[in-house]
């Protein structure tokens, strides 16, 4: 409990420290921190100039304009001069230092109760932040990061601080709190911060015309509770005004508000909506969530001959056929949103497919989707939408019909239609309040060109105002760059009368021009609805003159207009004739070169040029809707057809034609017609919306006709507001004339135009498949160069050369309340070789020649369309043109753009080279998420953009040559550390899978995880612990593994089976949770260390450009925090792993000790205690250290290796590949090293054990050594063993040192090469010095981690050496011997039964292929000849023994029982390949099982030589090198002998120094005894010791010990007396064929040994005493003995008197009994047996070595004990057995006599001969005869 508390305290303390330092970091970073800008960005242009007839380079720098730079903040409602208006208050540095940290701590410690106060104190508001210079990517990202970081510290919820919009000049509208604004004011790149006044949010008129209309509120942020909270508050305020407000959330950024009178109110007060609205919107403007408020505007709707004008040239018209207009939009989908679409009209109907309503069907011939909410596909009568769609793409299914001549322009295109809800009062459209809901489904349907012929006009008048709707449209186009929208300019005639949606920057705004004169004289008269004009006049007469006209009809007007002239205006025939007369008499006023009088004109409110283009819009004849009538109004398709056709005028009619033309243009590009005029697969291009807009504008033709401004005069269309060369506010850039460049190669009918068109660099050296539009950031520029040559003879020119360049970009949406709406400003300039002037776009011509003192021009800073039109002066010589596009101010970048150039009447082409710069000039270049730089080369071209630095949380990725975010700290921890943990878990799963495969079970992940966590495995026989838990219960698990209470389970396997990873995992499984936590902590620490070199390199990189040490504070704090993180988590990891190590060694040693204690006595006969203790004390800790060390080393090594590898590859993949060239060599060296390490480690452990064994034997037998004065001999032998250990250790050291030296040499050499090559790359500017330093540090990490990982394999090999010895003991522990081992499943028994030896046959072929599987049982095998081939019949007794032995081997004892598995005990081993562990099959040499070193070449090589090493003192055959000893090898050749020695050496390397038996499982069902009568019976019992299975001890014993009687066993030494006693106690197990022993009629093999021994006590002839008190030794057998029991037992054993004479009496400590005499030890042992009070007492020579008095006393005690007990005693003295109820006489393992003393004496047999000489002396020993 205390440990858990300490852990929690440490973890909590660590977390508090981390958060405090994070707080300090963010506070101090943002306090008085002069953040630097990585590169001083300067805009530099290079120009062609002429000086003394030489071409020199002259730089024009925009820095010259800085002194006159406009720093005003331009809002619609206010212009803020930041030079005059004061900044917000700035706390001085001292106050910042003193106040920030306490404020942070107080916030950190605030409780939830303080939340309301906190929200009030740190409530967010809108601020305007102005930057000192133009905003670039770096300063913008720094600003964003500042807001994020300070938000984390301040924990501001629910709104995040963020940038709302850009406001000119150089300012951001920002949502943040006051404390953030104070911190921000210290930034070097900030010049002014001010609060955003609520009045600047409101853009409303409160007049009767607009009052009550919906108002839209733009939101910076919103929550689900915002609307309800606002509405409740406002309605409570409006109660006194008798009005209410209804708020509706349109989306997360937009809210609709309607204020209305509360008719349900009982109040008698009047309702004033003006006052209510002022109050409501003033309150909303003061809320931090709102940022813009404007009134909703009323929406209004704004071709047989039109295509002839659109596809004509500036001078001629074309025919409306497939020759002059070959492309009609095939494969394209255009979209339209309007009042409805009459699906029954023949222009749209499909006989095979219905119109898909709210779904998409690309198989419909014309309408792929119809999206609407009215569940119809119809329009109102004479509907606007049907007419518009017909103009764009309508066409009958049968093209042969006459009506098809009135088809739309893009007849092959399909339509995606959005049905706008209509106002019932006037049929005007009502679009969705969220424009993305309109455009997104059309975009999803496949449309990429869209037309809108409707819009709204500001209620405030003709302002050309940029509304929120315009911002929404710009936003959609900005986020969908491959989409383009065309919008009608409006039909309001006046200047600045544009519809508000048409003021959007990114749309193509379409004005109206007149159509061909033919249209006026034919179609206009036929299909115009003059009835509507007449009724309008009649209505005016009704209202203005006389009520009687209210009932007039147009027919009456025609009848009476001759007498009443005023009625002519309502007569349809008169009106038609008047129009016909006017049209025919004034063709110059009615043709395609004139502007329609009604077309709305520019500019916008901020002076932007609109419209962009004009298209035919007057008397356009197209489809006519018949409303809900579903009859096809086309009839038979004949003409004229006034039911199906209608002629209308307006920009609404011009917009669909321009939309169709744009669609055809897109088809031209998508199908690959550009630039050859025919389809080329590699030329297929997916154009952006800006490119389509640029092409449309670039190829527009400025009209030079007239336009009527009023009813009394006309004006030249290019003379008014002619601000730009080639553009004005009336017609924009001119009228569409597509034929000038939309060339389609045909059969030579149409000649190739004289216009050459260039798109970016497409076609110069790039194909469409790999071409991409450029993007720019502030301070960057790009150049395009072209050449002009005069037209060659015969070329199709015939005109004046002319060039037109157009730049278009899709600008981010503007803040609607800004005075100027352009956000990103690009500028286009031109130079050429025939002029020294610099030409600026949209400036009216040349205005600057570079002369000192000349007034500098001001480039266009309000339009996102810029153009230059130039006519060469010298048309006879070649001219080079260079167009420069500069990123003047890109606050939200980078900004993509489209550049289009065309040249007329000459030969134009790309220049071979384009001089972009001066040699060695440098400029910043755009790098995503970073800053790059590029250098000008000798070819006057900018070089590759190299990463100079990356933004925070980004790093340079050399593979992609970008700044990649995945290298941020969070991603490092997640990807690398998390990936490593995943890998470790995967390996564990694989190990468990291997375990299940080895067991033959089906793998289950559920069982695996339950096994790992110790929660799911069932245990039979033990209930406290699962396989992986830490419980102390014992039991058999479902997978057959044994858990004995230590938590460590070992699966039963053959003892010599190799140790596999699942076996090793079984040792770790109880601690897997702790190890996992330790590993995870270690991985976090490693991940923190991985990132440190990156920041170190960053510091080094920033040093040259840093002004003060404070600028590096950020990086230093991060490094400190990372180091702290590494320290905390590495400490936790070390702490946990250290505890786990000790727990593991404790449990593992406990496990091994349990396995040793559970062994049968034969095991201890074959193995030295010193060797076993060596395993327990040395191998077990070594195994533990290796296991836990390997897991942690692998985890940390992989994490560090992979993490560092990611960095070095991203920094420089070239250098990384150089490093990896050495990996195979390092792997080979490690493999060779591991091979020798494995051999030498196993030999080292073996000889260490031998040395320990010899030392212990010498000290235990010190009496013998001293008695025979052999101290020097023992010293020499021990020294020899130590020398063996030293020599092997020396080889191991040499092996490891040599391998390490090779690795070190290679790695260091490689490091030098990498450093050299890295320095070269840094000099070549391929990457920076900081990156080189980081790379070098990471190389060190990689080297360190790779060395660790390679070393892990060596550790694993050493681990296997220790594991082999440990598992040899664990696997050989008998199953269910004691309560230490629990029951095994029957299927495991059956599995082991199948593995038993099957060599019990006489087949010679089987024995010849025998590989040490059976060395003892096949006596008839030819492989088992005696060494000399002599007979064994040397004596009758030997013959009898051999006979019995052969009988065993050939009789039933060698018969495999089919019903039960053989019990492999110390008797006969049926799977006894372990009885002679070191025996190598030799036809003539049956070696001693204890001989481990026969003919072993121990020099560590394979040459068969013997270096006199490795000979064991227990080896009795070490002289086989004697040339006279040819026994067994005389028939081998030299080659065979070497092969044999190599085989013997391999066997030697497998030596463990431990000899174990392969003990199979005892049947799982035990009989539990609760009481015992004490009756014992032997039936045909035969036995031999496992250490000498070829020597029998007992033969066919049949005897019975009855309860309550005393029995004696006498006979010569070695006759089997003591063995009988040990068999009763089951210290040894009988072979199933070796007879049975019964207790109370129950086979003792079926009684649990511990249960059996609870009724039996055995006193050995050699007493064993423990290092404990005398009292503890006597009471050892009882769990809680009383002092009375102990004293009574001592008295009965005649030990009480001498114990009482000792100083401490019963509390005297016995150190191995060394302070007692032999007799005293014997009496204490007897007392221990007496104290045990067992039913059966087995006494083995307990009176030996006692004086007569003591012996007599003990004999008397035994007589007392026999009452109710069964006593069996072995004795060599008459007195001990004289009074026994029955005596058994044994000789050579057989019972030769039995009876009472008198009966045996009367027989005069063996007993008599033994007793005859001691008849007079009861205490004389029996004689052995």
Curated annotation (Swiss-Prot):
Instruction: Write down the top EC class of this protein.
Output: hydrolase
Please name the GO terms that the record assigns under molecular function: ABC-type transporter activity; ATP binding; ATP hydrolysis activity; ATPase-coupled transmembrane transporter activity; serine-type endopeptidase activity
Q: Low complexity: which segments have biased composition?
A: 1388-1402, 1465-1494, 1515-1529
Protein name, entry field? Serine protease/ABC transporter B family protein tagD
UniProt similarity note: In the C-terminal section; belongs to the ABC transporter superfamily. ABCB family. Multidrug resistance exporter (TC 3.A.1.201) subfamily. In the N-terminal section; belongs to the peptidase S8 family.
Query: What does the entry give for GO biological process?
Result: proteolysis; transmembrane transport
> Which residue ranges does the record assign to the Peptidase S8 domain?
307-727
């Amino acid at each position: 409990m205390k440990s858990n508390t300490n852990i929690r305290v440490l973890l909590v303390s660590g977390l508090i420290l981390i958060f405090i330092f994070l707080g300090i970091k963010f506070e101090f970073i943002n306090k008085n921190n002069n953040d630097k800008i990585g590169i001083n960005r300067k805009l530099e242009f290079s120009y062609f100039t002429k000086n003394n007839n030489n071409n020199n380079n002259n730089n024009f720098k925009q820095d010259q304009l800085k002194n006159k730079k406009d720093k005003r903040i331009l809002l619609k409602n206010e212009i803020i001069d930041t030079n005059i208006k004061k900044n917000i208050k700035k706390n001085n540095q001292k106050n910042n230092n003193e106040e920030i940290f306490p404020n942070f701590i107080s916030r950190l410690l605030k409780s939830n109760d303080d939340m309301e106060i906190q929200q009030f104190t740190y409530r967010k508001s809108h601020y305007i932040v102005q930057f000192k210079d133009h905003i670039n990517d770096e300063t913008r990202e720094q600003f964003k990061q500042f807001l994020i970081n300070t938000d984390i510290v301040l924990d501001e919820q629910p709104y995040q601080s963020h940038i709302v919009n850009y406001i000119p000049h150089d300012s951001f509208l920002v949502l943040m709190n006051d404390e953030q604004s104070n911190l921000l004011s210290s930034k070097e790149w900030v010049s002014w911060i001010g609060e955003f006044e609520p009045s600047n949010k409101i853009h409303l008129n409160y007049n009767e015309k607009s009052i009550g209309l919906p108002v839209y509120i733009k939101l910076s942020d919103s929550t689900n509770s915002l609307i309800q909270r606002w509405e409740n508050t406002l309605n409570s305020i409006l109660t006194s005004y008798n009005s209410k407000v209804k708020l509706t959330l349109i989306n997360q950024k937009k809210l609709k508000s309607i204020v209305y009178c509360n008719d349900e109110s009982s109040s008698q007060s009047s309702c004033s909506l003006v006052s209510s609205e002022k109050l409501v919107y003033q309150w909303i403007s003061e809320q931090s969530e709102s940022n813009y408020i404007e009134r909703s505007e009323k929406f209004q709707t704004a071709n047989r001959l039109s295509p002839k004008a659109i596809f004509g040239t500036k001078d001629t018209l074309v025919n409306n056929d497939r020759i002059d207009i070959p492309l009609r939009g095939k494969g394209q989908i255009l979209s339209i949103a309007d009042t409805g679409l009459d699906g029954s009209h023949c222009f749209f109907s499909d006989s095979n497919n219905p119109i898909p309503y709210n779904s998409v069907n690309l198989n419909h011939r014309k309408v792929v989707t119809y999206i609407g909410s009215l569940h119809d596909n119809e329009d109102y009568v004479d509907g606007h939408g049907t007419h518009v769609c017909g103009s764009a793409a309508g066409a009958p299914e049968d093209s042969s019909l006459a009506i098809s001549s009135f088809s739309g322009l893009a007849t092959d295109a399909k339509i995606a239609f959005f049905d706008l809800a209509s106002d019932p009062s006037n049929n005007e459209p009502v679009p969705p309040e969220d424009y993305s809901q309109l455009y997104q489904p059309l975009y999803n349907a496949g449309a990429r060109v869209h037309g809108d012929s409707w819009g709204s006009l500001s209620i405030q008048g003709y302002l050309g105002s940029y509304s929120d709707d315009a911002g929404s449209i710009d936003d959609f186009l900005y986020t969908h760059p491959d989409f383009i929208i065309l919008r009608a300019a409006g039909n309001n005639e006046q200047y600045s009368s544009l519809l508000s949606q048409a003021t959007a920057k990114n749309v193509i705004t379409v004005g109206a021009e007149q159509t061909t004169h033919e249209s006026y004289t034919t179609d206009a008269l036929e299909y115009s609805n003059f009835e509507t004009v007449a009724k309008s006049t009649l209505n005016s007469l009704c209202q203005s003159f006389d009520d009687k006209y209210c009932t007039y009809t147009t027919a009456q007007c025609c009848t009476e207009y001759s007498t009443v002239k005023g009625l002519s205006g309502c007569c349809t025939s008169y009106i038609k004739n008047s129009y016909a007369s006017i049209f025919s008499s004034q063709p110059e006023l009615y043709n395609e070169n004139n502007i329609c009088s009604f077309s709305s004109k520019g500019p916008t409110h901020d002076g932007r040029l609109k419209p962009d283009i004009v298209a035919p819009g007057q008397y356009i004849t197209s489809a006519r809707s018949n409303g809900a009538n579903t009859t096809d109004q086309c009839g038979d398709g004949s003409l004229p057809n006034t039911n199906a056709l209608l002629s209308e005028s307006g920009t609404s009619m011009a917009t669909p034609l321009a939309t169709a033309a744009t669609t055809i243009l897109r088809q031209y590009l998508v199908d690959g017609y550009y630039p050859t005029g025919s389809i080329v697969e590699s030329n297929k291009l997916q154009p952006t919306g800006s490119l389509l807009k640029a092409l449309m504008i670039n190829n527009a033709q400025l009209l030079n006709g007239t336009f009527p401004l009023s009813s009394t005069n006309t004006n030249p269309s290019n003379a008014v507001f002619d601000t730009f060369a080639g553009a004005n506010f009336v017609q924009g850039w001119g009228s569409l004339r597509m034929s000038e460049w939309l060339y389609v190669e045909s059969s030579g009918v149409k000649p190739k135009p004289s216009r050459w068109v260039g798109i970016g660099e497409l076609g110069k050296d790039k194909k469409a498949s790999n071409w991409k539009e450029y993007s720019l950031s502030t301070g960057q520029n790009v150049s395009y160069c072209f050449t002009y040559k005069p037209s060659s003879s015969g070329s199709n020119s015939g005109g004046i050369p002319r060039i037109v360049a157009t730049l278009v970009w899709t600008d981010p949406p503007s803040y609607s309340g800004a005075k100027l709406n352009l956000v990103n400003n690009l500028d286009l300039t031109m130079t050429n070789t025939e002029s020294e002037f610099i030409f600026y776009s949209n400036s009216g011509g040349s205005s600057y020649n570079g002369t000192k003192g000349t007034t500098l021009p001001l480039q266009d800073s309000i339009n996102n369309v810029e153009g230059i039109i130039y006519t060469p002066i010298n048309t006879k010589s070649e001219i080079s043109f260079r167009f420069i596009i500069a990123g003047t101010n890109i606050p939200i970048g980078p900004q993509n753009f489209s550049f289009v150039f065309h040249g007329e009447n000459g030969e134009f082409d790309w220049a071979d080279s384009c001089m972009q710069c001066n040699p060695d000039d440098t400029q910043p270049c755009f790098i995503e998420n970073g800053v790059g730089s590029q250098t000008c080369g000798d070819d006057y071209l900018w070089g590759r953009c190299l990463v100079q630095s990356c933004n925070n949380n980004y790093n340079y990725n050399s593979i992609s040559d970008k700044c990649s975010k995945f290298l941020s700290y969070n991603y490092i921890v997640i990807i690398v550390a998390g990936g490593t943990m995943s890998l470790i878990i995967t390996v564990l799963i694989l190990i468990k899978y291997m375990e299940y495969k080895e067991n033959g079970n089906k793998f289950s992940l559920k069982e695996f995880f339950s096994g790992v966590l110790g929660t799911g495995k069932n245990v039979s026989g033990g209930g406290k612990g699962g396989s992986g838990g830490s419980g102390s219960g014992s039991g058999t698990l479902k997978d057959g593994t044994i858990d004995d209470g230590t938590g460590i389970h070992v699966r039963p396997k053959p003892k010599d089976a190799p140790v596999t990873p699942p076996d090793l995992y079984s040792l770790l499984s109880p601690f897997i949770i702790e190890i996992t936590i330790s590993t995870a902590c270690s991985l976090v620490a490693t991940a923190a260390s991985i990132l440190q070199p990156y920041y170190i390199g960053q510091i080094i990189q920033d040093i040259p450009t840093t002004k003060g040490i404070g600028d590096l504070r950020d990086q230093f704090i991060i490094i400190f925090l990372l180091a702290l993180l590494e320290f905390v988590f590495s400490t936790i990891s070390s702490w946990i792993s250290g505890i786990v190590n000790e727990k593991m060694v404790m449990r593992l040693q406990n496990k091994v000790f349990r396995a040793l204690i559970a062994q049968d006595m034969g095991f201890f006969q074959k193995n030295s205690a010193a060797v076993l203790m060596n395993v327990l004390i040395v191998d077990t800790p070594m195994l533990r250290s290796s296991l836990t060390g390997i897991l942690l080393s692998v985890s940390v090594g992989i994490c560090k290796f992979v993490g560092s590898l990611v960095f070095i590859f991203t920094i420089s993949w070239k250098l990384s590949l150089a490093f990896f060239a050495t990996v195979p060599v390092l792997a080979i060296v490690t493999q060779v090293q591991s091979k020798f390490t494995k051999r030498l480690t196993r030999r080292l452990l073996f000889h260490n054990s031998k040395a320990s064994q010899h030392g212990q034997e010498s000290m235990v037998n010190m009496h013998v050594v001293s008695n025979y004065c052999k101290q020097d001999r023992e010293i020499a032998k021990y020294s020899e063993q130590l020398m063996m250990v030293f020599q092997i250790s020396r080889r191991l050291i040499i092996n490891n040192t040599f391998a390490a030296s090779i690795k070190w040499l290679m790695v260091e050499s490689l490091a030098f090469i990498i450093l050299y090559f890295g320095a070269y790359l840094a000099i070549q500017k391929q990457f920076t010095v900081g990156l080189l330093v980081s790379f070098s540090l990471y190389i060190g990490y990689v080297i360190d981690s790779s060395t660790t990982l390679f070393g892990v394999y060596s550790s694993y090999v050493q681990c296997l050496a220790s594991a082999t010895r440990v598992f040899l003991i664990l696997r050989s522990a008998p199953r269910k011997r004691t309560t230490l081992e629990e029951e095994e499943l029957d299927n495991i028994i059956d599995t082991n039964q199948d593995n038993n030896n099957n060599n019990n046959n006489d087949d010679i072929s089987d024995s010849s292929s025998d590989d040490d599987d059976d060395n003892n049982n096949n006596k008839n095998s030819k492989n088992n000849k005696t060494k000399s081939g002599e007979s064994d019949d040397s004596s009758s007794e030997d013959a009898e023994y051999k006979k019995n032995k052969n009988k065993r081997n050939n009789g039933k004892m060698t018969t495999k029982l089919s019903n039960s598995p053989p019990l492999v005990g110390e008797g006969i081993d049926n799977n006894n390949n372990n009885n002679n562990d070191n025996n190598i099959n030799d036809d003539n040499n049956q070696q001693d099982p204890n001989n481990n070193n026969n003919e072993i070449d121990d020099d560590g090589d394979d040459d068969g030589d013997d270096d006199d090493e490795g000979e064991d003192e227990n080896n009795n055959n070490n002289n086989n090198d004697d040339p006279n000893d040819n026994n067994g090898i005389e028939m081998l050749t030299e080659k065979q002998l070497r092969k044999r020695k190599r085989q013997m050496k391999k066997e030697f390397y497998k030596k463990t120094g431990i000899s174990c038996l392969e003990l199979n499982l005892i049947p799982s069902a035990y009989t539990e005894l609760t009481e015992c009568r004490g009756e014992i019976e032997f039936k045909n019992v035969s036995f031999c010791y496992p250490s000498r299975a070829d020597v029998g001890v007992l033969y066919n014993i049949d005897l019975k010990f009855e309860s309550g009687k005393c029995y004696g066993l006498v006979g010569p030494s070695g006759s089997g007396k003591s063995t009988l006693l040990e068999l009763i106690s089951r210290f040894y197990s009988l072979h199933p064929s070796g007879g049975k022993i019964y207790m109370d009629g129950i086979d003792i093999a079926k009684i649990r040994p511990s249960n059996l021994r609870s009724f039996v006590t055995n006193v050995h002839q050699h007493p064993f005493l423990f290092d404990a008190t005398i009292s503890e030794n006597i009471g050892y057998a009882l769990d809680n003995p009383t002092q009375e029991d102990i004293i009574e037992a001592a008295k009965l054993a005649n030990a009480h008197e001498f114990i009482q004479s000792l100083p401490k009496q019963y509390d005297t400590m016995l150190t191995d009994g060394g302070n007692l005499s032999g007799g005293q030890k014997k009496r204490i042992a007897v007392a221990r047996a007496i104290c045990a009070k067992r039913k059966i007492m087995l006494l083995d020579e307990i009176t030996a070595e006692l004086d007569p008095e003591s012996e007599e006393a003990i004999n008397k005690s035994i007589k007392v004990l026999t009452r109710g007990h069964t006593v069996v005693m072995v004795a060599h003295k008459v007195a001990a057995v004289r009074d026994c109820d029955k005596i058994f006489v044994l000789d050579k393992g057989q019972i030769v006599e039995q009876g009472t003393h008198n009966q045996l004496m009367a027989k005069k047999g063996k007993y008599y001969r033994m007793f005859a000489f001691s008849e007079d002396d009861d205490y004389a020993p029996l004689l052995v005869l």
